[in-house]
Curated annotation (Swiss-Prot):
Alphabetical GO biological process terms: protoporphyrinogen IX biosynthetic process
Name of the protein: Uroporphyrinogen decarboxylase
Site entry (Transition state stabilizer), positions: D76
The organism's place on the tree of life at top rank: Bacteria
Pathway: Porphyrin-containing compound metabolism; protoporphyrin-IX biosynthesis; coproporphyrinogen-III from 5-aminolevulinate: step 4/4
The species this protein was found in: Bacillus anthracis
Catalytic function, reaction form: uroporphyrinogen III + 4 H(+) = coproporphyrinogen III + 4 CO2
Amino acid sequence: MVRTINETFLKACRGERTDYVPAWYMRQAGRSQPEYRKIKEKYSLFEITHNPELCAYVTKLPVDQYNVDAAILYKDIMSPLPAIGVDVEIKSGIGPVIDNPIRSLQDVEKLGEINPEDDVPYILDTIRLLTTEMLDVPLIGFSGAPFTLASYMIEGGPSRNYHNTKAFMYAEPKAWFALIDKLADMVITYLKAQINAGAKAVQIFDSWVGTVNVADYRVFIKPAMERIFAEVRTMGVPMIMHGVGAAHLVNEWHDLPLDVVGLDWRLPIEEARARGVHKAVQGNMDPSFLLAPWSVIEEHVKGILDQGMKQPGYIFNLGHGVFPEVNPDTLKRLTTFIHEYSKGQLAK
């Protein structure tokens, strides 16, 4: 069954005029929600993501609670890696830990290929369930970017400085490019499968790419990103790029064949546009503001909206994920304010 959905978010992704500014929040499904915390008392992340009914419920929860204009699939960026032979464990308080880190070209050559229908059927089943039976807003599929995935695979887990990753990139360029190309192939196949299952947009998260300078990005990372976006673009859905602490790379992202440039709070929207970013923009509230009094939040959000609304193609989001300490009522109030304030301003 084809469901009728609110396409305000998709229109903004395409740079079209909208009646109000659409909003959704990274990590909108998760630790800030009491309902989610109750589920986590019984089930692990692995168990939730491998259970389509449970995963769909968690994904839809913020749509019902906060009235956001898009849902994003609840899963981890590491989800596809076991399919290609990476031993990943999500450890509480640490994050992803990899038992077989990449150290050589031989390690890269041992990696396999992903077949989503066989390797991650539970993810595709969750998407189908959400898009055919549950959601009245678009579902965003996503993947980690090759650099961020490679950094986990080389470091063996989270890192503060990514020295091992960059040292590998500089010292072992043949192995580096083999790894990045292998991961690009995986990301392309993975995102296409999510779109075929029903995702109406996709976002690529390059969480740690801000550690790389512009010159190195152009040589070591950008060619693979160009290939990913060019290949996935043939699927006909909007594509979003997001990273953290990567304001120096926004023009490099803008050059890619994508639709939406994601910004964090370090770069004002008006400054990004002054630098030549004329594609749709998503962002860019510092999530720390969500812990402030409402009067402070409201004034800050007005400033962001006033910048974003100066041209069509603007989606409100955070510059990073929702903190566990954030009150869900604050997010609900925030969405209502974004919708009402922007509708009033855009009607003038």
